[in-house]
C-alpha cells in the first residue's frame, strides 16, 4: 500500500541523512 511505501522511503531517507551527518 501507499503507507508501506511511504514508510520505506522515509527509512531510506533516514539512512542517507545519518550517513551524511556521520561524514
Swiss-Prot record:
Any GO molecular function: toxin activity
The yes or no answer to whether the keyword Secreted is present is yes
**Where is it mainly found?**
secreted
Subcellular location, record wording: Secreted
Keyword annotations for this protein, in alphabetical order, are:
Disulfide bond, Secreted, Toxin
Gene Ontology CC terms: extracellular region
Tissue specificity field: Expressed by the venom gland.
Q: How is it modified after translation?
A: Contains 7 disulfide bonds.
Give the similarity note: Belongs to the phospholipase A2 family. Group II subfamily.
How is this protein named in the record?
A: Basic phospholipase A2 homolog
Q: Which organism is it from?
A: Trimeresurus stejnegeri
Q: What is the lineage of its organism?
A: Eukaryota, Metazoa, Chordata, Craniata, Vertebrata
Amino acid at each position: 500500500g501507499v503507507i508501506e511505501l511511504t514508510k520505506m522511503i522515509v527509512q531510506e531517507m533516514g539512512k542517507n541523512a545519518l550517513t551524511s551527518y556521520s561524514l
